[in-house]
Each structure stands twice: as structure tokens, then as C-alpha cells.
């Protein structure tokens, strides 16, 4: 048997130490609970989705909206891998450029809006052909597949000087998480017949993040019909109450659904596991 001071003994000790340290290094990267995906609402249409594999997606990151749980969130989020922008309006583009510059997040949106956001300061090397697409296209984002689906709205983009730029077509997102749920973020939209095709194309939608405020989008009654088309397990209302004009409420959505689906109202800033 080699002595404790022999070269073989020292190498063996180093190998044991490395193996012992490996689990600690692997656990340093924060992840959602095994098999669970965390969804955090930040008010309006802004969400953060963290997959079981640790991929972080920010959707329509207007993190400085009036319903945000605290100020300065764009400077505080520790990690974002991808930023999904449904259309070009200020309340959905939000803090995307600042967040991208700080985190290195890649942009997932339509090609036209992507080009306009690059012109407005979004880092060009984070908005390439690998993540820009168009309706019907699927982008692989870590352990999530993001498909751009139809929405009925407008999408003009105005830069910080008020100049208008192309915004392409508005869209929603279907996010299929490997080992996790299928999420549908409607974006801003009216009720559409296209929604009927989502279960056939993607299977069961687990969580539908749906606009309900009215005036610019579906109101609660229209959203309830949309829920009937999509048939999700859980409905999370969004895009309501931020401004006086978008006055639809989760209570009105519940009443219109008549118990046909679970309505779960998220508290801004509090992650929920699905």
C-alpha cells in the first residue's frame, strides 16, 4: 500500500476531492424543481419562465409597468437567456433592449420587429437568424421549443425618439418545455379561429396566459370563448388593470367560464410552479 506522501496517494486524494466537489458545482446553477417549470408574472403581459433545465425566458418584458412588484427589475434579474417579444408596442417591447445588453439574452420575435429593435439598440449578435423567425416557425431555446402563432392586433414600433419602424405581424407564443408543461401566451389579440387548431397541433395546453382587459384586446367574455377553443388545464389572466381602459377582471373571466377551467391569478413577482 502506498504511503500517504507517495505520488500515487496524492493523486488518489485529488481524484476523490474532485468527485466530492462535482455535485456542489452542478448545483450552483439555480433550476426549477425537477419536472417543474416556474412562471413569474411581473404585471401586464410580462412573464419570466424558468424551465427544469435552467433556461430562463422573459416574455414581453415591460418590467417597469405600473403593476410591477418593485422598481428597477430590468437591472436586477440575475439571468435571462431569451427575450420573447410578441409585437412592437411599447408595453410589450418594454425593457427588452436594456435587459438584453445586461444579460446577453437572445431575441425571439418576428424578423421585421427584430431588425427594428436592433436599429434601436438591441445587440445585433443577440438577434440573429437562429432566433428570429415568423408565424409558424419554431425556435429551440435551451430545453424549450418556442413556436410563433397567430394573433390579431397591430405591431408598429416607435423608438425612443418617436420615429415609427416596421413591427411585422403580431403573434402569440406556444412554449413546449422538455419534461414540463406546454404554455400558450396569447400576446395581444382578439378571439380567433386559429386558436381552435392549437390542441390539434400541440396537444394539451397546460397553461394559457391570456389577455382579458378589453379595449385593445379580448375582454373576459371573448377570452372565455378562447379558453373553450384551446381547452387548457389552467388559465392565467394578464393584460388587465394596468390602465383604466383595460378594465376586464379575473372575476368576470371566472363568471364567463362558469367553472369550465381553473383560473389562477398570479401575484406579481411570486413564482408559481407548473
Swiss-Prot record:
GO molecular function: hydrolase activity
Matching SUPFAM superfamilies: Metallo-hydrolase/oxidoreductase
Keywords on record: Hydrolase
InterPro entries: Metallo-B-lactamas, RibonucZ/Hydroxyglut_hydro, UPF0173, UPF0173_UPF0282_UlaG_hydrolase
Hydrolase is among the record's keywords: yes
The keyword Transferase is assigned to this record: no
Record-stated family: Belongs to the UPF0173 family.
PANTHER family with a match to the protein in the record: UPF0173 METAL-DEPENDENT HYDROLASE MJ1163, UPF0173 METAL-DEPENDENT HYDROLASE MJ1163-RELATED
Name of the protein this chain belongs to: UPF0173 metal-dependent hydrolase AnaeK_1127
Organism: Anaeromyxobacter sp. (strain K)
